């Protein structure tokens, strides 16, 4: 059975309401605080929860209290956080892998929307200090809570989370740029980007915040009616104000047995979702003989993959697009190689997620020597499915050179040896 969840938003959605539903379902505030403090913001906020009444119904209200002493220490510094800084905080926090990947994706989605509204690149979006702390706690806390509840992942690594249509709200709200119409521009852009269904419930207040919209539009699999499910628990997260109807976000937690067979009920059976960094630069004036050396230096400092693509550049000059894929912790080293060994004046950085099959190496003895076989699979025993088997290139090349025989002969002998070992083990 797959654990899935459904967000019912009769009065909209915000980050603190999401946290309220999760705490209501049993996610410990102490757990959230412990993990959030690894982001380096422990002195900037305090997280607390309480039971409140909304139109006679009890729900959980989560508060993100900003600590006054930190605000006063920094109020004259005009300090804020941009997307790359927040991404680096998340990457260095040691969060559970799914929570890390989801948090990065939500912040990227929010920055893309805000950047589109203001006509700037996502990396240039400035999160005001107070707003940034709120957003970090709300977004990362929500991702931590969904992971803690054990909600299953789909093939792309995102939670099996569903959501109702959004009420649009109405009226105006005061923001950093003055009075704004509701829904505010960032929320409208997020709805547009995802193609969300919306409707009016007649309440002229801000019902959907940018943070709440970013969480939903990034993590939700489908919008609309609830999926077929057996409800096991319902979490109730309270909004801040009283409205004509109970201002409560409801998170239904349950099970479904009607999903496609290739969607697993745990992250362990799915490809691992990991965070990678991608560097790109376009070059049209580098000696082609230098490219091979650049590759060697990049792999020496830890690049996972390096490749080039032919491109046409300005003034009709032919050039190359040089792309480097690496782990975030080796990004600076790879970037330093590019600046040192190429003629580039600028490098683009992006953070992405990739799904990686489980893999292992098995040594196989051939008559010419040992060759390591890389084996990739998905699923768990006894339903483990092997999807790829490849002899290591360098092992085959070394033996081919040593014995002066074709590389393909070594490769075929290694594969034959692996297949024979599988047959003998049955």
UniProtKB/Swiss-Prot annotation:
Gene3D superfamilies per record: mk0293 like domain (3.10.20.300), Transcriptional regulatory protein pf0864 domain like (3.30.70.1380)
GO molecular-function term, one example from the UniProt record: lyase activity
InterPro entries noted in UniProt: Ni_insertion
Keywords noted in UniProt: Nickel
Keyword tRNA processing: no
PANTHER family: NICKEL INSERTION PROTEIN-RELATED, PYRIDINIUM-3,5-BISTHIOCARBOXYLIC ACID MONONUCLEOTIDE NICKEL INSERTION PROTEIN
NCBIfam families per record: nickel pincer cofactor biosynthesis protein LarC (TIGR00299)
Similarity comment text for this entry: Belongs to the LarC family.
Protein name: Putative nickel insertion protein
Lineage start: Bacteria, Bacillati, Cyanobacteriota, Cyanophyceae, Nostocales
């Amino acid at each position: 059975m797959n654990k899935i969840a459904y967000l019912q938003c009769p009065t909209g959605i915000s980050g603190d309401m999401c946290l309220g539903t999760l705490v209501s379902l049993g996610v410990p505030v102490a757990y959230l605080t412990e993990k959030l403090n690894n982001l380096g913001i422990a002195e900037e906020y305090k997280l607390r929860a309480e039971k409140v009444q909304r139109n006679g119904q009890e729900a959980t209200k989560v508060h993100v209290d900003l600590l006054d002493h930190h605000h006063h220490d920094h109020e004259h510094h005009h300090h804020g956080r941009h997307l790359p800084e927040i991404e680096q905080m998340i990457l260095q926090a040691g969060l559970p892998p799914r929570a890390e990947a989801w948090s990065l994706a939500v912040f990227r989605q929010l920055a893309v929307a805000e950047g589109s509204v203001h006509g700037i690149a996502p990396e240039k979006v400035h999160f005001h200090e107070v707003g940034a702390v709120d957003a970090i706690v709300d977004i990362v806390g929500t991702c931590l809570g969904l992971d803690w509840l054990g909600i299953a992942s789909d093939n792309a690594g995102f939670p099996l989370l569903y959501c109702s249509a959004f009420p649009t709200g109405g009226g105006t709200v005061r923001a950093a740029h003055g009075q704004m119409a509701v829904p505010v521009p960032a929320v409208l852009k997020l709805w547009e980007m995802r193609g969300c269904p919306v409707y009016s419930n007649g309440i002229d207040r801000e019902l959907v915040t940018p943070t709440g919209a970013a969480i939903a539009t990034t993590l939700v699999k489908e919008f609309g009616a609830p999926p077929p499910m057996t409800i096991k628990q319902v979490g109730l997260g309270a909004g801040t104000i009283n409205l004509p109807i109970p201002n409560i976000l409801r998170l239904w937690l349950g099970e479904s047995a009607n999903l496609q067979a290739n969607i697993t009920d745990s992250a362990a059976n799915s490809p691992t979702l990991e965070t990678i960094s991608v560097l790109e630069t376009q070059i049209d004036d580098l000696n082609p003989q230098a490219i091979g050396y650049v590759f060697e230096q990049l792999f020496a400092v830890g690049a996972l993959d390096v490749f080039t693509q032919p491109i046409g550049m300005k003034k009709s000059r032919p050039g190359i697009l040089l792309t480097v894929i690496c782990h975030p912790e080796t990004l600076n080293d790879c970037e330093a190689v590019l600046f040192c060994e190429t003629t580039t004046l600028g490098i683009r950085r992006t953070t992405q997620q990739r799904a990686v099959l489980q893999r292992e190496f098995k040594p196989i003895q051939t008559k010419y020597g040992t060759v390591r076989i890389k084996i990739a699979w998905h699923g768990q025993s006894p339903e483990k499915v092997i999807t790829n088997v490849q002899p290591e290139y360098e092992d085959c090349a070394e033996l081919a050179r040593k014995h002066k025989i074709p590389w393909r002969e070594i490769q075929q002998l290694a594969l034959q040896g692996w297949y024979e070992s599988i047959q003998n083990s049955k």
